[in-house]
Amino acid sequence: LKRIGIISDTHGTFDEPLREFLKDVDEIWHAGDIGSLETADRIAAFKPLRAVTGNVDGGLIRRAYTDFLAFDCEGVRVLMTHIGGYPRHYDPRALARIHQVEPRLFVCGHSHILRVMYDPIYSLLAVNPGAAGNYGIHKVRTAIRLVIDGEEMRDMEVGEWPRSSL
């Protein structure tokens, strides 16, 4: 059994509300636009981190992380990228990887809009945790927690906070 925290689009923010929401997870998965290598290092010092690069992440982050990450968590095949889209509207690069990897859980970010959808065509759960940072179009900051127990994904929770005035 693993407790997972899923975040995206921090754009340099990893503050107390986010840490409090993620304090009991076993791993944090970051779907890109981390903001800086220093932010990634702060997250990784807090909990084990799996991350991908986002479209605004610079060269240092690109040397440390990749655009796509495929891995197994418990009995669930996971594919994570930044610009992924959602069922019936996938980004073409993401769709090619979905065909290749055949994930049961597809994690992406970029839109700053929290969205969780089951895709019956590819038999996967598509998860976008929205934006956990302060930069962007979103009105509230969001993140997701869930439990992966063997092949079962369950107990999904959404964290929601106001944007900082800083």
Where are these regions (language model features)?
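Short, motif-level signal for alpha-helix interfacial/capping segments enriched in acidic residues
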Residues: T10-G12, H82, P87-D91, L95
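Active-site glycine-centered loops adjacent to acidic/histidine catalytic or metal-binding residues
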Residues: D9, D33, G54, H82, ...
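Charged phosphate-binding loop/patch that engages nucleotide di/tri-phosphates or the phosphate backbone
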Residues: D149-L166
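N-terminal active-site segment of His-dependent metallophosphoesterases
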Residues: L1-L49, D57-D67, C73-G75, M80, ...
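Active-site-proximal beta-strand elements of phosphoester/diester hydrolases
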Residues: R3-D9, R77-I83, L124-G130, D155-V158
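Conserved beta-sheet core of the metallophosphoesterase superfamily
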Residues: R50, R88-E152
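Generic beta-strand structural signal
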Residues: H30, D72-C73, Y118, I148
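Short active-site segment of divalent metal-dependent hydrolases/proteases
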Residues: G12, S36, G85, I113, ...
